[in-house]
Regions:
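Conserved double-stranded beta-helix
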Residues: 1-52
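Conserved hydrophobic/aromatic beta-strand scaffold that supports enzyme active sites
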Residues: 5, 35-39, 88-90, 98-100, ...
Length: 184
């Protein structure tokens, strides 16, 4: 277990989550990391369900810094031209629907223009041999808890590079919404 969070997309204009990949926020030694999402309410297409670009987990990792070297938490407009955004699959369903995406998968969601909120419970898990590179979740009550199997004696390293986020110990870690909206 790596971490969990409750993501509320409020009704009547809840913020857009721009296209991004998760692994750059909390890099690991390899890419055997996934996120499970559980919709806590019924979610229909008007509520801005999460959209996933199929197959994008096999593509490149994108830089989430802008041209002035500021962390934005989203893929640049220029890099988005490399993706088939029209192929996005939007994951709606009744309360209890489970979504699963790999840490490299490009995903995002539009503003929620419905009157209903869209709560999404997210839990990130990694293989025991996929070790966190940063200490973003270290010290959490359940962080790095082995849910199945046993602790790894050997770490597995992927030969592909992974972008490092800012040093969260020197800056206040903000939510993806704050990073993407350039809030202070």
């Amino acid at each position: 277990f790596h971490h969990s969070k409750l993501n509320f997309k409020w009704g009547d204009g809840g913020e857009e989550v721009k296209w991004h990949q998760d692994i750059q926020f909390w890099p690991h030694t390899n890419f055997e990391v996934l996120t499970l999402g559980v919709y806590l309410e019924d979610v229909d297409p008007t509520m801005a369900p999460m959209g996933i670009i199929p197959g994008s987990h096999n593509g490149p990792l994108f830089d989430l810094y802008d041209e002035s070297d500021t962390w934005t938490g989203n893929i640049s407009e220029n890099d988005l031209t490399l993706l088939e955004l029209d192929s996005a699959e939007y994951l709606s369903g009744p309360a209890g629907t489970v979504t699963v995406h790999n840490c490299r998968c490009v995903h995002g969601s539009a503003p929620n223009l419905s009157s209903r909120s869209r709560p999404l419970f997210l839990c990130a898990y990694s293989a025991a041999h996929a070790l966190p590179i940063t200490d973003l979740t270290r010290g959490g009550k359940y962080s790095e808890t082995i849910v199945r199997g046993k602790a790894a004696r050997w770490a597995k390293f992927d030969s592909r590079p992974v972008l490092l986020p800012p040093d969260w110990s020197k800056t206040r870690h903000k939510s993806i919404f704050e990073h993407q909206q350039n809030e202070n």
